Design a protein with these regions (language model features):
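Conserved catalytic breakage-reunion loop centered on the nucleophilic residue
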Residues: 1-195
């Protein structure tokens, strides 16, 4: 455990599987480099979000285009990656997968490790450490997204930007407009009463 801690603090990637959009370099398995195919998908996801698309609309678009989900992409590249999230024969893109990508600061070049730990080597159950105890190395590798775009996306994710099932884009004032009296966010309400 101490060895891993030292490697993490030196900016070495010690996880067996890296974030979608990156791969380990051939010369040093502890360093990350951009995977051109998956990296362009990540950049497209951020662009779609910046254009006002919801996570659900982004996931649907990626599925329509036949783009492999992170799980399927890893499998297609010979990885023995397993996950508990797979529910069907082929794992498709979901709004949860898209949101995880949009929130992951690995895409601005930051390596964040040591989020989980076990009480000791005999106990297999892990728990999430407080964020202050995570090891964060900023500007560790080449980013896929600019800091500015990442920050804008984080602000968008913090707003209520739900859309109706038949709508692809978020309303212009979603998550911004608030009630002048109580300060609650304004939401869309469908009326079924005629008149």
């Amino acid at each position: 455990m101490i060895n891993l801690e030292i490697k993490r603090k030196k900016g070495e990637c010690v996880t067996p599987f890296v974030a979608f959009g990156y791969r380990k370099t051939k010369t040093d398995k502890h360093k990350l480099e951009i995977d051109p195919s998956a990296g362009s998908v990540v950049q497209d996801i951020f662009k779609m979000k910046l254009q006002g698309m919801s996570q659900d609309a982004i996931a649907n678009r990626l599925n329509e285009l036949g783009i492999l989900s992170p799980f399927e992409y890893k499998i297609s590249n010979g990885s023995r990656y397993e996950t508990g999230f797979r529910q069907k024969e082929q794992a498709l893109w979901s709004s949860v997968t898209v949101r995880r990508i949009l929130e992951n600061e690995v895409y601005i070049g930051n390596l964040v490790q040591g989020k989980r730990t076990t009480p000791n080597h005999k106990v297999k159950q892990t728990y999430v450490k407080p964020e202050d105890d995570w090891i964060r190395i900023e500007k560790n590798h080449e980013p896929l997204v600019s800091d500015r775009d990442f920050e804008i996306v984080q602000r968008l994710l913090g707003m209520d930007t739900r859309t109706s099932p038949d709508q692809k884009q978020v309303y212009l004032l979603s998550g911004i407009a608030v009630c002048a009296d109580c300060g609650a966010p304004m939401t869309r309400k469908v009326s079924t009463v005629a008149g």
